[in-house]
């Protein structure tokens, strides 16, 4: 339906598709609409990356502590060779298996072990790229932490000590946290 409406309004392609009677039918009173939605979704926050960034190493879906070490080391080596000045961690950097809704297997890492592995990774990343700006965009696996709190301990939501960026000590590693709802302009 949306595509058809966009076509009729002339908002698609280069063909002449505008139908003036469709856009504004005769005797149409804009004040007497059938549906009027006043509450809209909030606008996303926008993050504009600094214009001085030249080379970005883009890492995504690492799923620590279940990472592919060979692939991760190749990507890091590539970033070192290219002398990147920015690293973009695009979500699902940690797996958060322990916080998932899935039935837990006994041989998988516990949440505290996943946090330890993340601290280790972020510390090594900062040492390897001491001058790079690092951004960590929240992914759906990181959101598992919030969902776990919502299911098991709603009272803790909003307390700084239980926010994922605080637990991961991102400030200590000089890593910028980018919330899931943020629109990013490169």
Q: What is the meaning of each model-derived region?
A:
Residues 59, 64-171:
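Core catalytic region of metal-dependent phosphoesterases/phosphodiesterases
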Residues 1-58:
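Acidic, histidine-bearing metal-coordination/catalytic regions of metal-dependent phosphoesterases
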Residues 7, 22, 125, 153, ...:
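Extended hydrophobic/Leu-rich segments
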Residues 167-185:
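Short acidic low-complexity segments
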Residues 46-51, 96, 154-155, 180-181:
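A broad, low-specificity signal for short, low-complexity segments enriched in glycine/proline
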Residues 13-16, 146-147, 185-186:
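Short, solvent-exposed polar/charged micro-motifs at secondary-structure junctions
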Residues 55, 133, 174-176:
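Conserved beta-strand segments of alpha/beta enzyme cores
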Residues 39-41, 69-70, 175:
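Short gly/ser/thr-rich secondary-structure transition/capping motifs
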